[in-house]
Amino acid sequence: MATAAFTPWILGLTGGIGSGKSAAAERFVELGVHLVDADQAARWVVEPGRPALASIVERFGPGVLQADGQLDRAALRQLIFADPAQRKWLEQLLHPLIGQEIFSYLAKAQSPYAIYVSPLLIESGQYHKTQRVLVIDAPQELQIARTLARDNTSAEQVQAILQAQLAREERLRHADDVLVNDGDLAALHEQIDRLHHFYLTLKGGQP
């Protein structure tokens, strides 16, 4: 008799800018969990030669390309943050393509559960394709301070990004688990280790 194919359950991991999603994701990887980041998938679908990049250039012009033909993400970001209609168009183009890349990749995972990391997990509706949602949460002033320390950006740009993202309360409403990341890295790792051991006991993301 053939053995049934192994299929991991999928944990959606999300949080606002500067909440600590990347640090949390790194710890899960250290623990052996198969993970894909929406930002990685977003880069895959706009590589030179892919249809999505051609559509973006047709919409916004050649100014969104670097000299080597790669997408100039900073130039595109400036165009869409000031224009909600353009941002919506871009999201409608990319989200289905990114979802296809992500869930094809996650289906091949060999860990008991796999993680999909996305800042837009709720807004895009992709959380419907996960079995459980983990929200990384942090006070807004800490989100701003972390982002300013990490990125070459202004406080005004960070505020604009925060305002464009889903309201914190709405994100938390969709959470099965909440990790408050308001301490140091060791405290974050301790919380993740506990969650990981809990997740290993779940079947299909449920107790």
UniProtKB/Swiss-Prot annotation:
Please list the reactions this protein catalyses: 3'-dephospho-CoA + ATP = ADP + CoA + H(+)
Q: Give start-end ranges for the coiled-coil region(s).
A: none
Q: According to the UniProt entry, what is the EC number of this protein?
A: 2.7.1.24
Every DPCK domain range = 10-207
Sorted alphabetically, the Gene Ontology cellular component annotations on this record are: cytoplasm
The main location is cytoplasm
- EC main class here is transferase
Q: Which UniProt keywords apply?
A: ATP-binding, Coenzyme A biosynthesis, Cytoplasm, Kinase, Nucleotide-binding, Transferase
Q: Which SUPFAM superfamilies match?
A: P-loop containing nucleoside triphosphate hydrolases (SSF52540)
Q: In which pathway does it act?
A: Cofactor biosynthesis; coenzyme A biosynthesis; CoA from (R)-pantothenate: step 5/5
Keyword ATP-binding: yes or no? yes
Subcellular location(s) per record: Cytoplasm
The entry's ATP-binding residues are 18-23
Q: Which GO terms describe its molecular function?
A: ATP binding; dephospho-CoA kinase activity
For biological process, the GO terms are: coenzyme A biosynthetic process
Cross-referenced Pfam families: CoaE
What CDD domains does the record tag this protein with? Answer: DPCK
For this chain, the family text in UniProt reads: Belongs to the CoaE family.
Any idea what job this protein has?
Catalyzes the phosphorylation of the 3'-hydroxyl group of dephosphocoenzyme A to form coenzyme A.
What name is this protein filed under? Dephospho-CoA kinase
Q: Which gene encodes it?
A: coaE
